[in-house]
Amino acid sequence: MTEQRKHKVITLMGPTASGKTALAIELVKNYDCEIISVDSALIYQQMDVGSAKPDAAELAVAPHHLIDIIDPADSYSAADFRKDALLKIEDIISRGKTPLLVGGTMMYFKALIEGLSPLPGANDEIRAQIAVEAQANGWQALHDQLKEVDPVAAARIHPNDPQRLARALEVFRISGKSLTELTKVKSEAFPYEAIQFAIAPNDRKVLHKAIETRFKAMLGLGFVEEVKKLKSRDDLHLELPSMRCVGYRQCWQHLDGEYDYETMVEKAIVATRQLAKRQLTWLRGWPDLIWLESGAENNLDTVLRYSR
């Protein structure tokens, strides 16, 4: 373990549409590193356009680990990511290269670097039962249940946040212990030295414009057709984490007739901007970050200087 701590990994975090992938590819060209994706949308197969997955030309230059690894109908947790990422890091280091972790899923970064509590895995039967209860009695009734067994979590989780509410109840029903109690115990610390960068524009308007431009480009690349194909499957629905990804949810609802095309475009752009705002909030509270300005000419030199 002491020897492992000498090894460095580079992390490149940032909000959506901030230029992470472009900078990461330049790093691969100029530094002996391999990219590990830290993105909860890129893990899914058949979700290429709307997730801004690197294209074939980009992947030929800079292959990405941990993209296209699961079906959209399957579940994948932060604990799954931590396990998979640690294995990839070990493999890359064993081949004499530097791992470069790139993405905007801050929950994954937090799980990897700070460790995770030993929570039980998903239980399909219990999840189904919770869904039945929610359908019959409403999420407020389930929130009242959570107040009884885990008042601390109930105070933190809103009744209109079904994913987190269901998970807190699921943990209690599986383990007999509250989420609050279990999260006091952390898994083993991150065994590497992390050199951590964050990239974002200084002007929020620049990021907002980049988000709008990128989403409209996705529409030109066939995003609606991609969602139509996913929607034609009988095992996908809006309650799945994959279909709750920003853009996919709004497009699905448009195809369901909930609103017209123009409204879908507007809602998807607004939702993406809200995601970027949450990502930036996380990053501002993240320690030991070296900040980079999106599009700055010296970004590559800065990363190389700190990483060597």
Swiss-Prot record:
* Keyword presence, RNA-binding: no
Domain of life of the organism in this record?
Bacteria
Positions binding ATP in this chain are 14-21
What Enzyme Commission number(s) does the record list for this chain? 2.5.1.75
Q: Does the keyword tRNA-binding apply?
A: no
Single biological process term from Gene Ontology: tRNA modification
Substrates-to-products reaction catalysed: adenosine(37) in tRNA + dimethylallyl diphosphate = N(6)-dimethylallyladenosine(37) in tRNA + diphosphate
**Annotated Gene3D superfamilies:** 1.10.20.140, P-loop containing nucleotide triphosphate hydrolases (3.40.50.300)
Q: What does this protein do?
A: Catalyzes the transfer of a dimethylallyl group onto the adenine at position 37 in tRNAs that read codons beginning with uridine, leading to the formation of N6-(dimethylallyl)adenosine (i(6)A).
- Under what name is this protein listed? tRNA dimethylallyltransferase
The source organism is: Shewanella piezotolerans (strain WP3 / JCM 13877)
Gene label: miaA
